[in-house]
Amino acid sequence: MKVRASVKKMCDKCRVIRRHGRVMVICSTPKHKQRQG
């Protein structure tokens, strides 16, 4: 899980979602998981 100020899709499988007011990226590649901090 990467925590960064700007979350972006890193590949075609990445999905940008909102959970509990946080912007997150979920992906089948574990390396691509991000959340906004």
Swiss-Prot record:
Superkingdom of origin: Bacteria
Task: List, alphabetically, the SUPFAM superfamilies matched.
Answer: Ribosomal protein L36 (SSF57840)
Record flagged with keyword tRNA processing: no
Q: Name one GO molecular function term.
A: structural constituent of ribosome
GO annotation terms (biological process): translation
- What GO terms fall under cellular component here? cytoplasm; ribonucleoprotein complex; ribosome
Keyword Ribonucleoprotein in annotation? yes
InterPro entries according to UniProt: Ribosomal_bL36 (IPR000473), Ribosomal_bL36_sp (IPR035977)
Q: Which UniProt keywords apply?
A: Ribonucleoprotein, Ribosomal protein
As for family, the record states:
Belongs to the bacterial ribosomal protein bL36 family.
Q: Which PANTHER family match?
A: 50S RIBOSOMAL PROTEIN L36, CHLOROPLASTIC (PTHR42888), LARGE RIBOSOMAL SUBUNIT PROTEIN BL36C (PTHR42888:SF1)
Question: This protein is called what?
Answer: Large ribosomal subunit protein bL36
